[in-house]
């Protein structure tokens, strides 16, 4: 008999405000521990230097984390001009120092180059893999390997300010965009070099900035619960966002209660749908009049709703530590 996973069955998404100096995995494990969750996963790592929004999916919410990985992101970044580092951020070694000598017009022209659809060559100091190894492992050994450029889109690049040798920008971009690489490339275009000294992710998909919560706040709530002799879940669970918020932009297909059991067994079912839906388009599946979210699916060539990823409804609690 398979052993039940430790932790409770709790489903949802925590908008963590990650602090600087910690890895995304460390932050993830802390959140999982605070909520006593049986499963947890984050939706796109932030560098230790970076702070800000790190959605953490709990329980069945982990099934939809890929859709947040694919979502647009927004960052506030401050770059130090005049110095280039080997990692393109302040965690690296300075490899070149140059004078800062450009006009406002040259800066604005350079910024415009990065707007819209472009190709970006990822930094050697990234988690992308080459022959099974992360690029940063090669970089640490002084080995440079070939990297293919990748298409990215910068939807917005807003100039926030320039104070002395520090330039601050607001960047709204597509998945897979390396802000460090943009700053390094910008520094080279300006002829002075640059590297990231502050990076904060302010948005993932349409999640509100105001709903973020830090590890310190979570820890304080757990301590408060212990003082009040109540279960920490009483104070923590209201912070969770519904897991279907990860796919809120998918069109909804509602399945009548009468045929819901067939769908939940993995069968494709015929339901009334919007004529505008395309074959193989991902949809958000809800059940009955209460429109309970149960997963995602696609409309197949026969006009049937085919489940792709369904949540598991647990009737029994998981084991606790």
Swiss-Prot record:
Family matches, as Gene3D superfamilies: Pseudouridine synthase, PUA domain
InterPro entries the UniProt entry points to: PsdUridine_synth_cat_dom_sf, PsdUridine_synth_N, PUA-like_sf, PUA_sf, tRNA_psdUridine_synth_TruB, tRNA_sdUridine_synth_fam1_C, TruB_C
Leader sequence segment: none
Catalytic activity annotation: uridine(55) in tRNA = pseudouridine(55) in tRNA
One matching Pfam family: TruB-C_2
Keywords: Isomerase, tRNA processing
Gene Ontology annotations of biological process type: mRNA pseudouridine synthesis; tRNA pseudouridine synthesis
EC number assigned by the record: 5.4.99.25
Catalytic machinery residues: 47
One annotated GO molecular function: RNA binding
Role description: Responsible for synthesis of pseudouridine from uracil-55 in the psi GC loop of transfer RNAs.
Record-linked NCBIfam families: TruB
Family (UniProt): Belongs to the pseudouridine synthase TruB family. Type 1 subfamily.
Descriptive protein name: tRNA pseudouridine synthase B
Organism of derivation: Shewanella baltica (strain OS185)
